[in-house]
From Swiss-Prot:
This is Follistatin-related protein 1. The lineage of its organism: Eukaryota, Metazoa, Chordata, Craniata, Vertebrata. Gene3D superfamilies: 3.30.60.30, EF-hand. It comes from Rattus norvegicus. Homodimer. Interacts with SCN10A. Interacts with DIP2A; DIP2A may act as a cell surface receptor for FSTL1. Interacts with BMP4. Interacts with CD14; this interaction promotes TL4-mediated signaling cascade. One of its GO terms (cellular component) is extracellular region. The gene is Fstl1. Residues 1-18 form the signal peptide.
Amino acid sequence: MWKRWLALALVTIALVHGEEEQRSKSKICANVFCGAGRECAVTEKGEPTCLCIEQCKPHKRPVCGSNGKTYLNHCELHRDACLTGSKIQVDYDGHCKEKKSVSPSASPVVCYQANRDELRRRIIQWLEAEIIPDGWFSKGSNYSEILDKYFKSFDNGDSHLDSSEFLKFVEQNETAVNITAYPNQENNKLLRGLCVDALIELSDENADWKLSFQEFLKCLNPSFNPPEKKCALEDETYADGAETEVDCNRCVCSCGHWVCTAMTCDGKNQKGVQTHTEEEMTRYAQELQKHQGTAEKTKKVNTKEI
């Protein structure tokens, strides 16, 4: 019996002590404002301090935070902001709507230097297989003569091969030039055209995007070692294959040039739609190429000085 009275006495003392603590806390924290997500607490020294709210009331009034997360109510949002030390605001009332965002992981189709060099190697291998040595009573065909034959076959009469003519020449041997860097056949066909442009750029002395026979000969000369080009951006140089992101787009360093996707942030491919985002992307691409041009000029000057 006495144990029951003792337990009751202890409970009464605890309640009285709790009420006194609560009155003391209310008195100490009376003029303290802690802000959203925080509450006033009393330290061991009896001084007020602001701490993250320990537990919010369970009333249900969902809100969507600026971080895209749904909270049960305003209190839970501000409490989370306090606990994580981040700035979270109420975006709108209700559950957050699912956002269809475009991941910048979608990269543009590009011809890397490895793709370009592999295509070039296959073309040379195919042409070398057509070499016919001179016989006792017959004249064969050397490498230059074979190139001359193909050059004349695909030249439209202006003594130059442009990219479309070069591509037709390349497609003469479908097996040899069938580069499959992408699972999509359409992308692989696009890749081939891009690599043809990269090959033309290798020996296009006057930058007219056409090859004379001498330029064509240099491009496919087995002893010619294609140079490795890097991309420049903000006083830094990046190796082939390097990537950078801008908004919802990804830019890739390809054969010395930055190549960017052209996507709006709602996930739609831009095809002639003049939007503010597209203009920004155009300026960004121009800026990348400007840095690239400056870097190449600097490189030439340094080479001359050496």
